[in-house]
Each structure stands twice: as structure tokens, then as C-alpha cells.
């Protein structure tokens, strides 16, 4: 059973009772997943950006969008319009597929993994987790990467509070640490 079907058939009715909601449309759901990577070296090294775009496409199954500097910052040696990172926004079936692979395959492959921080919610039910290396994803092989780079993964939910968001992610299988 896919994560999307599991959400519709078992998680949504369970959350409806747990959260004491009256309507099934009030139950929090995952709206989108943003995968973002900032590349400071992209200003001087165009191959780093190219490699990063390919890795993001391999991990997410969707072409990455190049993010550009909004204004020049002399201290960082960047000018307005220079490429400084890449991002992918996943919705629908690709989002559920990525979430399933991230929770069940990638997270357990993190070294010394004891669960994700339960305090990384933003106050509106959205959750962000930082990944230090792209090697946790089974699609990326160690031989094909030029350097280890991290990324930020933001799970945007329709939850109105952190408690609702946490309840949703726990039901989806997100392994929160006990601290």
C-alpha cells in the first residue's frame, strides 16, 4: 500500500478522531515538500551546480530549479543574478513517493541516527529537516559524487498548529527522537 493510500484509508480517519475534528477536510495533510540546497561554491564552480542539479533530479525524480542571488553581497563575492543554489517543489504522487523513500530508506541510513528533532516545527505545522550528506539516498552512489553536500527538506502541511503537524508526521512514520 502506498503512503497516499495509507493516508486516505487509515491515517485520515484516525487523525479525525484523535484531533476531535468534525469534518474530514479539516484533517491536516501534506501540501508539498520543498528540497533545497544552497551552493556557495556555485558562484566560482559551475560544475558544482551542474552536479547538484543532476543529484537533485535523481533524488526527487523532478528537474531542479536554479535559485539566483536577489542582490549583490560583496562579502560573499556574489553579484545579483548569480546562481547560488537549487530547489525542487514536489506535490501529488511524486511528493508521497519521495516522502515514503525519505522516511523508510534515507533516514535510517544516517550515521548514528536516533530520530529527527521534534522541535524543528515552524509554529504553523510545517517541518524542516537538514540532511548533512546526499549519500543517505540509495539513488546516489559514492563513486559518482564529486563532494559531499547537504540539503534542507521542508514538509509543508495544512495543519494549523505544531501539535497537529507532529501528529500527522508521526502517523506517516516520521521517526521523532524522544528528547
Curated annotation (Swiss-Prot):
GO biological processes: translation
Assigned keywords, A-Z: Ribonucleoprotein, Ribosomal protein, RNA-binding, rRNA-binding, tRNA-binding
Gene Ontology molecular-function annotations: rRNA binding; structural constituent of ribosome; tRNA binding
Keyword rRNA-binding: yes
Pfam families: Ribosomal_L5, Ribosomal_L5_C
GO cellular component terms attached to this protein's record: ribonucleoprotein complex; ribosome
UniProt subunit comment: Part of the 50S ribosomal subunit; part of the 5S rRNA/L5/L18/L25 subcomplex. Contacts the 5S rRNA and the P site tRNA. Forms a bridge to the 30S subunit in the 70S ribosome.
Functional description taken from the UniProt entry: This is one of the proteins that bind and probably mediate the attachment of the 5S RNA into the large ribosomal subunit, where it forms part of the central protuberance. In the 70S ribosome it contacts protein S13 of the 30S subunit (bridge B1b), connecting the 2 subunits; this bridge is implicated in subunit movement. Contacts the P site tRNA; the 5S rRNA and some of its associated proteins might help stabilize positioning of ribosome-bound tRNAs.
Protein name: Large ribosomal subunit protein uL5
Source species of the chain: Prochlorococcus marinus (strain MIT 9215)
